[in-house]
């Protein structure tokens, strides 16, 4: 980032509360739609990415995030695509970390595929990042190559080790895929818990065309949990995060296991989050086509008055819940945009 002076947050800006009384305190920002993997459940192999000129600059992303922090966001997650492939992205992390220092922000974190972690883990830790999520669906090199199409498992594992060595807490996110990795979930859990890492399982989400039918990938996590219960003691944990995951403690490993089930059990009633794309589009719901342009008001004025008005309008229309569905009759994705654009 350049040394340009950022617009200071509006002092005393009001909190963001939607029509259903949910206060927005968690912002997820996709800083790029590009990725060095082509995961089969996320995008097609010949994915066409956005022109670079369409993306917000790092300075604009900083200003946008800061405006939301001034409105009550306490947790900020940077996503992609793969956030660590964006040029100079660490300058954005370093700049945003000032909000940790002032106490305006409780947590600055990111979700990554791990491919670039060995390069950036130490710097992330130095910037005040304390924990990260790593997307990893298998420990089998052949399956990993098949799922990611372009990925190198050894490089990801080295990145995870570098993150742990830098003092970052790591949580593994794994998408459960029918007839691909569902049989490997117990061993993936044992591996993660053995290293002191949590594991969260995620159902396939119907976002964007991927060149394959998602019904052939989908396995309900209720079935996965039932299978695990045959060999492990799963004790429900209280919901303390306000997020989409439902957690259990696995008595035999002492580790924590999460289930994100948008299709079999939605998580809308306690939703406290919104998403911003790398082009400045605000999505107040992952599973709806709602969209509000924040780039125009961001660029229209050096102060945040127009931006805050646009944010208020968008939050005022946040829907009660999503419309995710996967079945043979509805084989097209429920939502046209890709997760890589929305932010994973």
Curated annotation (Swiss-Prot):
PROSITE patterns per record: MOAA_NIFB_PQQE, RADICAL_SAM
Disulfide bonds: none
Names of required cofactors: [4Fe-4S] cluster
Matching CDD domains: Radical_SAM, Twitch_MoaA
Entry EC number(s): 4.1.99.22
Catalytic activity: GTP + AH2 + S-adenosyl-L-methionine = (8S)-3',8-cyclo-7,8-dihydroguanosine 5'-triphosphate + 5'-deoxyadenosine + L-methionine + A + H(+)
GO molecular function: 4 iron, 4 sulfur cluster binding; cyclic pyranopterin monophosphate synthase activity; GTP 3',8'-cyclase activity; GTP binding; metal ion binding; S-adenosyl-L-methionine binding
GO biological process: Mo-molybdopterin cofactor biosynthetic process
Domain Radical SAM core: 19-239
Pathway(s) it belongs to: Cofactor biosynthesis; molybdopterin biosynthesis
Positions bound to [4Fe-4S] cluster 2: 268, 271, 285
Positions annotated to bind S-adenosyl-L-methionine: 41, 81, 135, 205
Residues where [4Fe-4S] cluster 1 binds: 35, 39, 42
Residues engaged in binding GTP: 28, 77, 111, 171, 273-275
Entry's cofactor comment: Binds 2 [4Fe-4S] clusters. Binds 1 [4Fe-4S] cluster coordinated with 3 cysteines and an exchangeable S-adenosyl-L-methionine and 1 [4Fe-4S] cluster coordinated with 3 cysteines and the GTP-derived substrate.
Keywords assigned by UniProt, alphabetized: 4Fe-4S, GTP-binding, Iron, Iron-sulfur, Lyase, Metal-binding, Molybdenum cofactor biosynthesis, Nucleotide-binding, S-adenosyl-L-methionine
Family statement drawn from the similarity comment of this UniProt entry: Belongs to the radical SAM superfamily. MoaA family.
Binding partners and assembly: Monomer and homodimer.
Physiological role: Catalyzes the cyclization of GTP to (8S)-3',8-cyclo-7,8-dihydroguanosine 5'-triphosphate.
Family annotation (PANTHER family): MOLYBDENUM COFACTOR BIOSYNTHESIS PROTEIN 1, MOLYBDOPTERIN COFACTOR SYNTHESIS PROTEIN A
Protein name in UniProt: GTP 3',8-cyclase
Species the sequence originates in: Rhodopseudomonas palustris (strain BisB5)
Gene name tied to this protein: moaA
């Amino acid at each position: 980032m350049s040394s340009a002076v950022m617009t200071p947050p509006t002092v005393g800006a009001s909190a963001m509360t939607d029509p259903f009384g949910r206060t927005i305190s968690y912002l997820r920002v996709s800083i790029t739609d590009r990725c060095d993997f082509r995961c089969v459940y996320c995008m097609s192999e010949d994915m066409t990415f956005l022109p670079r000129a369409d993306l917000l600059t790092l300075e604009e992303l900083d200003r946008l995030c800061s405006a939301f922090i001034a409105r009550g966001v306490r947790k900020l997650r940077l996503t992609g695509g793969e956030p660590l492939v964006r040029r100079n992205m660490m300058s954005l992390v370093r700049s945003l970390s000032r909000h940790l220092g002032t106490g305006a922000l409780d947590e600055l974190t990111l979700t990554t595929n791990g491919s670039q972690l060995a390069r950036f883990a130490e710097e992330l830790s130095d910037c005040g990042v304390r924990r990260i999520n790593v997307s990893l669906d298998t420990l089998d090199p052949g399956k990993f190559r098949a799922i990611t199409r372009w990925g190198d498992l050894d490089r990801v594992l080295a990145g995870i080790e570098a993150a742990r060595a830098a003092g970052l807490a790591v949580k593994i996110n794994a998408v459960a895929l029918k007839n691909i990795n569902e049989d490997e979930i117990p061993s993936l859990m044992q591996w993660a818990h053995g290293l002191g890492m949590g594991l969260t399982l995620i159902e396939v989400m119907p976002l964007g065309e991927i060149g394959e039918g998602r019904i052939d990938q989908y396995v309900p996590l209720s079935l996965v949990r039932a299978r695990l219960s045959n060999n492990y003691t799963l004790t429900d944990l209280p919901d303390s995060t306000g997020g989409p995951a439902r957690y259990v403690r696995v008595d035999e490993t002492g580790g924590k296991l999460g289930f994100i089930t948008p299709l079999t059990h939605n998580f809308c009633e306690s939703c406290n989050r919104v998403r911003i794309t790398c082009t400045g589009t605000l999505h107040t719901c992952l599973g709806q086509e709602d969209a509000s342009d924040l780039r125009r008001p961001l660029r229209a004025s050096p102060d945040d008055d127009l931006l805050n008005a646009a944010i208020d309008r968008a939050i005022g229309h946040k829907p009660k819940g999503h419309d995710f569905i996967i079945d043979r009759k509805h084989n097209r994705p429920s939502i046209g945009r890709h997760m890589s654009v929305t932010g994973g």
